[in-house]
Design a protein with these regions (language model features):
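Low-complexity, flexible helical/coil segments
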Residues: 59, 71-79, 96-100
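Short N-terminal helix-initiation segments at or just after the protein's N-terminus
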Residues: 1-11, 62-73
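Mid-chain, well-packed structural core segment of small domains
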Residues: 67-89
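Acidic-leaning, charged glycine-interspersed low-complexity segments
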Residues: 82-130
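Oligomerization/assembly interface segments of phage tail-like spikes and tubes
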Residues: 53-71, 116-128
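Short acidic, gly/pro-rich beta-turn/loop elements at beta-sheet edges
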Residues: 46-48, 71-73, 130
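Small/polar-rich, solvent-exposed N-terminal microdomains that initiate assembly or binding
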Residues: 1-51, 87-97
């Protein structure tokens, strides 16, 4: 399995997992609140030697929860965390543990001059062997 195939599989599984927990994943038009955006990085392959033909790939997964109010953002953040906590996505023939590595509490985001939104950011890490 190639790294790009794994990336596509992880991204699709992430969106499906969130949708199954009734979390609206942002589409091209951000016209309704609340929603979450997801960013899955290109995998990093460390130079470690595993002693066989396998390679370890590590993905960074970032989520940004967006709501019109702080309460809306907090409620959606709880659903996102519930969906991803202890989730073990399948890659290849095995499932792998997703780790929650960082979280920023909801905060008012004043970067958008035409609207008032609250955002919360979380970082997750997923390492797989292929």
């Amino acid at each position: 399995m190639k790294a790009g195939e794994v990336l596509a599989q992880v991204a699709a599984a992430l969106d499906a997992r969130l949708a199954a927990h009734k979390v609206r994943v942002a589409a091209a038009a951000f016209d309704a609140y609340p929603y979450v955006t997801t960013y899955v990085s290109s995998p990093v392959a460390p130079t470690e030697d595993l002693g066989d033909s396998r390679r370890r790939l590590t993905f960074s997964i970032n989520t940004v929860t967006v709501g019109e109010t702080e309460a809306q953002c907090v409620a959606l953040l709880a659903r996102v965390t519930d969906a991803l906590h202890r989730w073990r996505p399948e890659v290849g023939e095995r499932s792998w543990r997703l780790e929650h590595v960082a979280a920023m509490p909801p905060a008012y985001d004043d970067d958008l001059p035409d609207r008032r939104v609250w955002t919360a950011r979380d970082a997750w890490s997923l390492s797989v062997l292929i």
